[in-house]
């Protein structure tokens, strides 16, 4: 079984934010695979299904980004899974808008949602699918970063991200069916 967690903030006011591309990707993946987020469990909205022979659970934590680890920890215990069984879909400021990167482990890279997961589950050894949202500009400071990640995509950037979300959903399917090495070779830009 694989547990796929999309990171984001709950609520309609956040739905189009850069910080919510994890939720957006999971919604697309769920739709393409006929999975509904029809359950509330472990501080998350969840849905389950199968990809080939692999059972999967999709989860969107409803704790707000900075407390995502609480939901992930509960989900791991509920389904009796280990960190090696999870895939976290997240936004990444350090990647240009629309770029994808799959990797196992590593630091949180300043991402508070990932930091919360690492703290609450006690390891950084889980797969991440990062979707680039770009930096606000070369002069960024804390306030500009917050405004950027909580801002919505505009115009041309929205088109780039729509394409990236579609590719990220493909990357998830490849990751589940063919493994990290194959998916990384195919989708890391």
Curated annotation (Swiss-Prot):
Q: Where in the cell is it found?
A: Cytoplasm
Q: Which GO terms describe its cellular component?
A: cytoplasm
Task: Name the residues annotated as site: Stabilizes the basic form of H active site to accept a proton.
Answer: 91
Query: What cystine linkages occur within this chain?
Result: none
What superkingdom does the record give?
A: Bacteria
Pfam families, per database record: Pept_tRNA_hydro
Q: Which reaction does it catalyse?
A: an N-acyl-L-alpha-aminoacyl-tRNA + H2O = an N-acyl-L-amino acid + a tRNA + H(+)
Quote the Gene3D superfamilies the UniProt record gives. Peptidyl-tRNA hydrolase
KW Hydrolase (keyword) present = yes
Read off the CDD domains from this record.
PTH
GO MF, one annotated term: tRNA binding
Q: Which GO terms describe its biological process?
A: protein quality control for misfolded or incompletely synthesized proteins; rescue of stalled ribosome
> Which residues participate in tRNA binding?
14, 64, 66, 112
Q: What is its EC number?
A: 3.1.1.29
SUPFAM superfamilies xrefs: Peptidyl-tRNA hydrolase-like
UniProtKB keywords: Cytoplasm, Hydrolase, RNA-binding, tRNA-binding
Does RNA-binding appear among the keywords?
yes
Q: Where is this site: Discriminates between blocked and unblocked aminoacyl-tRNA?
A: 9
Annotated catalytic residues? 19 (proton acceptor)
Description of how the protein assembles with itself and partners: Monomer.
Under HAMAP family, the record lists: Pept_tRNA_hydro_bact
Q: Which protein family is named in the record? A: Belongs to the PTH family.
Function as written in the Swiss-Prot or TrEMBL entry: Hydrolyzes ribosome-free peptidyl-tRNAs (with 1 or more amino acids incorporated), which drop off the ribosome during protein synthesis, or as a result of ribosome stalling.
Instruction: Spell out the protein name for this chain.
Output: Peptidyl-tRNA hydrolase
Which organism is the protein's source? Dehalococcoides mccartyi (strain ATCC BAA-2100 / JCM 16839 / KCTC 5957 / BAV1)
């Amino acid at each position: 079984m694989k547990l796929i967690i999309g990171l984001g903030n709950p609520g309609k006011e956040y739905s189009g934010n850069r910080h919510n591309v994890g939720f957006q990707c999971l919604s697309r993946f769920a739709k393409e695979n006929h999975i509904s987020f029809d359950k509330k469990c472990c501080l998350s909205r969840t849905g389950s299904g199968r990809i080939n022979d692999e059972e999967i659970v999709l989860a969107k934590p409803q704790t707000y980004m900075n407390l995502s680890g609480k939901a992930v920890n509960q989900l791991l215990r509920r389904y009796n899974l280990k960190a090696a069984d999870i895939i976290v879909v997240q936004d990444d400021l350090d990647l240009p808008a629309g770029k994808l990167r799959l990797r196992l482990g590593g630091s949180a890279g300043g991402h508070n949602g990932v930091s919360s997961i690492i703290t609450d589950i006690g390891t950084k050894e889980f797969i991440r699918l990062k979707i680039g949202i770009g930096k606000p500009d070369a002069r960024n400071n804390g306030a500009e970063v917050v405004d950027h990640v909580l801002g919505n995509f505009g115009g041309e950037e929205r088109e780039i991200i729509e394409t990236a979300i579609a590719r990220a959903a493909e990357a998830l399917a490849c990751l589940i069916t063919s493994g990290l090495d194959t998916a990384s070779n195919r989708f890391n830009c």
